[in-house]
């Protein structure tokens, strides 16, 4: 989860988020090099009085500033496309969970089980226990097995919502009448927090998401107790 005055990304908990973090660092390095080059050229223009008044054309310079941006765009586009395909691909999920956005709560249905569904509301500030997080705790957490591919089917009952868990690299729009999907895979157990990331009305800020990733045996015990 995010902390006060945090400048970087949240710790990656899924393979997708690790790839996104690496892509961020890769792109940031390219942007830093371009910015340094531009600042260097500007500083030369401001500190020197050297001019070349006889230059009518510069084929070499024109070739360089045509090819170099194309190469830079390719260096950014190829890793980006690779990650996009990775995020869209779901191979043999062990579990499917359907998520529906409402004003202003989430409902979840474990489609592989006959009658395992519940609503998830934010816990009001006055009802929080010591150590719990304001505006982030819910009455029913989404319990999922760790280290296994899980398919999330996401939609909405009313207006646009967005189901997002940053540490897992997840952000999928919940659109009425349309079913979007995302892959959830956690490398370690723990609680992972998210929120609705699409303005959906007056209580938009009160739609937290809490995923509880546990070992498979614990998940089986939990699902048996819920049915």
From Swiss-Prot:
Biological process, per Gene Ontology: ATP synthesis coupled electron transport
Sites where the protein binds Cu cation A1: 161, 196, 200, 207
CDD domains: CcO_II_C (cd13912)
UniProt key word Transport: yes
Positions on the Mitochondrial intermembrane side per record topology: 1-14, 88-227
Enzymatic class: translocase
Cofactor(s) for this UniProt protein: Cu cation
Transmembrane segments: 15-45, 60-87
Main subcellular location: mitochondrion
Residue intervals on the Mitochondrial matrix side: 46-59
Positions contributing to Cu cation A2 binding: 196, 198, 200, 204
Molecular-function annotations in GO: copper ion binding; cytochrome-c oxidase activity
Pfam families per UniProt: COX2 (PF00116), COX2_TM (PF02790)
Domain of life of the organism encoding this protein: Eukaryota
Substrates-to-products reaction catalysed: 4 Fe(II)-[cytochrome c] + O2 + 8 H(+)(in) = 4 Fe(III)-[cytochrome c] + 2 H2O + 4 H(+)(out)
Membrane topology qualifier: Multi-pass membrane protein
Gene3D superfamilies on file: 1.10.287.90, Cupredoxins - blue copper proteins
GO cellular component: mitochondrial inner membrane; respiratory chain complex IV
Positions bound to Mg(2+): 198
Compartments (UniProt record): Mitochondrion inner membrane
Subunit structure: Component of the cytochrome c oxidase (complex IV, CIV), a multisubunit enzyme composed of 14 subunits. The complex is composed of a catalytic core of 3 subunits MT-CO1, MT-CO2 and MT-CO3, encoded in the mitochondrial DNA, and 11 supernumerary subunits COX4I, COX5A, COX5B, COX6A, COX6B, COX6C, COX7A, COX7B, COX7C, COX8 and NDUFA4, which are encoded in the nuclear genome.
Role, per record: Component of the cytochrome c oxidase, the last enzyme in the mitochondrial electron transport chain which drives oxidative phosphorylation. The respiratory chain contains 3 multisubunit complexes succinate dehydrogenase (complex II, CII), ubiquinol-cytochrome c oxidoreductase (cytochrome b-c1 complex, complex III, CIII) and cytochrome c oxidase (complex IV, CIV), that cooperate to transfer electrons derived from NADH and succinate to molecular oxygen, creating an electrochemical gradient over the inner membrane that drives transmembrane transport and the ATP synthase.
Protein's name in the database: Cytochrome c oxidase subunit 2
């Amino acid at each position: 989860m995010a902390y006060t005055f945090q400048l970087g990304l949240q710790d990656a908990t899924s393979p997708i988020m690790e790839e996104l973090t690496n892509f961020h660092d890769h792109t940031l390095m390219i942007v830093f090099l371009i910015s340094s080059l531009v600042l260097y050229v500007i500083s030369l223009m401001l500190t020197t009085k050297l001019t070349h008044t006889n230059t009518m054309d510069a084929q070499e310079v024109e070739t360089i500033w045509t090819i170099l941006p194309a190469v830079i765009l390719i260096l950014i586009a190829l890793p980006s496309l690779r990650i996009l395909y990775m995020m869209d691909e779901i191979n043999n999920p062990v579990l499917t969970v359907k998520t529906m956005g409402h004003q202003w709560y989430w409902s979840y249905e474990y489609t592989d089980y006959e009658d395992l569904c519940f609503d998830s509301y934010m816990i009001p500030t006055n009802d929080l226990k010591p150590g719990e997080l304001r505006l982030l705790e819910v009455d029913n957490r989404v319990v999922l097995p760790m280290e296994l591919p899980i398919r999330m089917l996401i939609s909405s009952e009313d207006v646009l919502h967005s189901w997002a868990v940053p540490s897992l690299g997840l952000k999928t729009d919940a659109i009425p009448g349309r079913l979007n999907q995302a892959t959830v895979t956690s490398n370690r157990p723990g609680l992972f927090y998210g929120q609705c990331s699409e303005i959906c009305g007056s209580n938009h800020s009160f739609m937290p998401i809490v995923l509880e990733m546990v070992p498979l045996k614990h998940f089986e015990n939990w699902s048996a107790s819920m049915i």
